[in-house]
Amino acid sequence: MVAFTDKPRFGTLLTAMVTPFTNEGAVDVDAAQSLAAHLVDGGCDGLVVTGTTGETSTLTDDENVIMFKAVKEAVGDRAAVLAGTGTNDTAHSINLSRRAQEEGVDGLLLVTPYYNKPSQAGVKAHFEAIADATDVPIMLYDIPGRTSIPIETNTIKALAEHPRIVALKDAKGNLGETTKVLAATDLDVYSGDDGMTL
């Protein structure tokens, strides 16, 4: 993902990492660390670990934490490490976010609650509860094609008032709405849709 804004907190170019597995189906820590180092050596400013590309919904919480720790150890301070800790369950998201914070991640990527289709008030309450329960900067992830619910522009504007909500990964595919967010907030906005960027 590429930032639309100048001097973004997490860097300009972030890569959503895959989660490598062994032939036995376990998380492959060595491969994850090798991949993370390779991506940073190749110019990535930040890595998203166990986001939706990293199969977070198929991992146990312990496997997620293994990945957070492994990637942070591999890259240290050479790149920002964001942990994909968003789920469709607020309490679960808070717990996983706190565990990511304990591993020293630089930020959290929180996808919109999927499947349940909450109202915009529910979306806002979900994200605010996680932000209130942690001390880590947060990037919201708006990908309605996968979650079935957008984060509407007015909801994003309201969430941008929270001191820990600092960025948006926008995969909505609507540059008009992206422009409104850029004009109305101080959020760092990243493109979550390569076709819209390139």
Q: PLM features: what roles do these ranges have?
A:
Residues 1-2, 190:
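Short amphipathic alpha-helical surface micro-motifs
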Residues 2-15, 19-148, 156:
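Active-site beta->alpha loop and helix N-cap motifs at the rims of alpha/beta catalytic domains
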Residues 132-133, 144-198:
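Catalytic alpha/beta core domains of metabolic enzymes, predominantly
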